[in-house]
Amino acid sequence: MRGGAWARLVTALMLLVQGKCQQAQECSPGGHRILQSPYRSVHFDSVYLQYSAVQDLICDHSLSPGWYRFLIFDRPAEMPTKCVEMNHCGTQAPIWLSLSDSEALPLPGEMKKLTACATWQFLFSTEKDCCLFQIPVSVRNCGDFFVYLLQPTQGCMGYCAEAISDVKLHTCGPGETENEGGCVGQLSMAQPPAPPAPPGRPKISVELLGSLVFCRCTFDVSPTNTSVGFLIAWSRLSSQEIKEELRQESTLQAFSLLELDGINLRLGDTIFCSAAVFYLEKPDVQSIAVESQEFFAGIKLKPELDTISEDGKEYQLKIESTIPIVCSEFSELDQGCKISLKLKTIEQGKEHLGLNLALSSCHVDLHQNSCANGICSQAVLYYTAVTDFSRDGDRVTDIIVEPIVNDVFLWDRYAPDSIQIKVKDVPSAYCYSFTDPHIITFDGRVYDNFKTGTFVLYKSMSRDFEIHVRQWNCGSLHYSVSCNCGFVAKEEGDIVTFDMCSGQLHESPSYLFVKNQESSSSNIRITESYLGRKITIWFSSGAFIRADLSEWGMSITLRVPSLDYRSTLGLCGTFDENPENDFHDKNGIKIDHDDNYIAFINEWRLQPGRSMFDKVPASSRFPAKPSYCSCWLGTAMHHLLSHHLDSRSHLEMASGCKGIKHLQFSSLIPDLDITSEYINSEALAGKLSPHVPREENNLNFLLQKNAHPNLSKLDLNLPHPGNKILNPPAYLSDERHTQDQEMRKSLQNRWKRQNVKDFHPVYIFQSLGQGNLEEFSYFFPEDHTEDSQPEFAPSWPTASGLTEFSVLAICQQTLANSSIGRLCLPFLGRTLNHVVDMCVKDVLLKDDVNWAEGGVALLENECERRVLEDGKRNVEENRKTVEGILEVLKCPNLCSGHGECMGWGCVCSPGYSSYDCSHSYGMQML
């Protein structure tokens, strides 16, 4: 057959085929209907529709029987011939066209009867069934497109479609390859199309759909004239900080959802999503993938600072959930929808050093709320470093959250990540004003203040805390020297006056008055040691002032907390670890001229009528201080030393949230809490309740007091303050064992130097008003003496014949060879030498060896301080030394060999008394 005839035959056959197609009614525009919902795309994840737009779900159970053609975004589409995943194509059970190995799609003009399948996966099943349901479908190839004879489904199923190219639906020729239904071989040599513009950076958010939580990845897309799809990938960080892919999908929507199911994606995961754009016509042509910022799914603890100091400052701890709170249907309505968190603190390091960090609460609730700016629920609490008055170095504390117990599977047993807080150790400081007085500043500088009058011992520049002291002439036979006779201490609304300056030397009782200016409760604590020889006033900041009483007056010990570091003025110096600038003026500027210490003392001497002895400062309101908890997840006490040094019971702390102040009050010297004797309801009612001396330290007395004192607990929520008379320490004789009537009678002579009407003791227990306080004012002549430092040059031997060598031997024996001096020598160091030098000077000036014992109290206080500061470290090395120190602090001089050391102190043998059993009945005590 000739070539021309062959060509005419082929043309005729083609026209015949086309004629048959044109004759098929279903191929004509009016012979079929169009299904063009983009949700029918095999790339569309329909989970979102099930929870947010259920009305848009594809359900073909109401589809009218007939011929249909598929379009997606006005582009040709056809039913897929491969199994489609469940929850795609805008429905739960997607329907696809199943072709057996022997089956193929019809050629142009042909029609075939085929089978469609619906995919389904049963609950708790790990495998899907691609052909659980079968539906007969007829397919006609109309040349440029397919049409399908469809019928309604049995349930909420939907017919799927996938986009194809505009290329004719015919078998590709030699050298051509099919791509989404099109022949592209002839384009292989052409310039490849430019990739689409990349999307904007994806953002991950969360949303609650019903009772399920989904992560949503969204991004912006540049406008385009070409149909595009999106390739979205989800990944998370593994425990080894390596990204691992969770899921990848192609979709027509500029978002993707991933369920936070607690199995594949869990709370505590760090999640990423990436997105790329591709052409629907050419899926292999893609933009670069753009990845989101990391998204943390869970609860985070966000501290204001992760390194803080022992300075009393408070810091905010935010607890934030990036995931909405989900509650089960069984949740109690009256409890609300919330997640409850229990917080604990764990101290790092092997040494058992006690509480380091306190929280305002050990329990916090996260309530259900709407999400905003990435936060779905938030709670705030506070943390602060515990001022422990120990040189324990910088320490690290973990704040952990116990695993959550919840009915919702997603939240149950979830434990948010812990955080670490480093606490920098800041020193506390002690100042001593003893006997003459000799003053040892906070930074260790030693000087003498022989002046009389009223002085500013201490003033904080960072808070409302100030102490004034009075010094009177304390009876030297040859020289004019002074001693402390009283103090007034004020911390915010609490004012304490301890005063024996109103009477005569050796005769004046002590007057203790407590006032709170702003509320019915006071934040102080008063303790007594050694049967009244030591009186300590504890303040809520951790500061204390201690008076060691004697017949000539009192020696004063002052401790201030680390929050006053580099913020102090007054006779006690600057507290900045630099003794060179301790002599300063009222502006804190160092005094440099030759007589700097004289000028320094004059700078802090108060004019008559200007001190807190004369007038109580005006009342001020102070903000309420938040309470704090010990959330310490610690162990029970396992060292003897810890039992004595820790300010609170570790067992008590470990039991949960125990209310504490953000500082630790510690005392190694056994004390008795006598706060209620000075701050109680009887004082408010104006009832007389005299303080009974405790010199009668017989066995019955100790048994009544129930032995061992509580060295740890400080109840700072006390009743309204009152005031009382505190008798001076007893210099025991038989006549001291008298009745209350004789003691009260002795009170009548105590205001011998007052310049107002005679004192009546009942006034002390009446109103706390300003007028009453002014009524108690007295004339203090030392405020009106000439402002000059006594100049004298004492020499050896003294008038009574005491030599320097003999006095030094007495001081060495009294102090260095005392039980406290010997046992505490490793802790005291050169302080012992300072105290011995003070002793020698005291005896020289007074020409009286009885003054040698004045330094024992300083050794006791300094020893207690050193052990508290340093004793917690090297516990095993210091164990025996500290045990001995604790014994002599409890029973001074080991009861002088005339008594038995018990839990509270010395129980004296018959015929002996005093706190150390050193006094024999009938012997006048020196």
Swiss-Prot record:
Pfam family of the protein (one): D8C_UMOD
Superkingdom of the source species: Eukaryota
The keyword Protein biosynthesis is annotated on this UniProt entry: no
Gene Ontology CC terms: extracellular region
Location relative to the cell: Secreted
Keyword Disulfide bond recorded: yes
Keyword annotations: Disulfide bond, Secreted, Signal
Residues spanning the signal sequence: 1-19
Stretches assigned to the VWFD domain: 429-612
SMART domains linked: VWD
Location, primary (coarse class): secreted
Disulfide bridge partners, by residue number: 431-572, 474-483
Name the record gives this protein: von Willebrand factor D and EGF domain-containing protein
Native organism taxonomy: Eukaryota, Metazoa, Chordata, Craniata, Vertebrata
